[in-house]
Swiss-Prot record:
This is Holo-[acyl-carrier-protein] synthase. It is found in: Cytoplasm. The gene is acpS. Keywords: Cytoplasm, Fatty acid biosynthesis, Fatty acid metabolism, Lipid biosynthesis, Lipid metabolism, Magnesium, Metal-binding, Transferase. It comes from Hyphomonas neptunium (strain ATCC 15444). Its cofactor is Mg(2+). Its EC number is 2.7.8.7.
Length: 137
């Protein structure tokens, strides 16, 4: 069953302006060390950050909280890449607690994330699915 859905559209040029104006202060406030390292290692830094910013917003919407609200902060919503390259989340703090609260007993949460960009836009969609946990036989 679907227990949350969210999407967000982020202007890449707005992220670039934030980087130009606030630099490391902006990075440190919004992104995890892993996300910062990933973005700085890429040729298209603003696009990388914009997709992750959109993902954080989309996840916060799927959690039903917005950000920063209800104990969910930017850095609690870590965007990662699985070994396959597929994007995903590493939730901590208030975000992990909120997801646990949303997940029905006897279920586990699975988060689906997709990211795309087409200058000047970056977009993210999140679906949170609750899957029944198989009982041992």
């Amino acid at each position: 069953m679907i227990i949350g859905i969210g999407n967000d559209l982020c202007n890449i040029e707005r992220i670039q302006r934030s980087l130009d104006r606030f630099g490391e202060r902006f990075e440190q406030r919004v992104f995890t060390p892993h996300e910062i390292a990933k973005a700085r290692g890429r040729r298209r830094v603003a696009e990388t950050y914009a997709k992750r910013f959109a993902a954080k917003e989309a996840m916060a919407k799927a959690l039903g909280t917005g950000v920063p609200r209800a104990g969910v902060h930017w850095k609690h919503l870590g965007v990662i890449n699985l070994p396959s390259g597929k994007p995903g989340f590493e939730l901590t703090g208030g975000a992990a607690a909120r997801l646990a609260k949303l997940t029905p007993p006897g279920h586990r949460a699975v988060v689906h994330l997709t990211l795309t960009d087409d200058h000047p836009w970056a977009e993210a969609q999140v679906i949170i699915e609750a899957i029944p946990v198989a009982e041992p036989s």
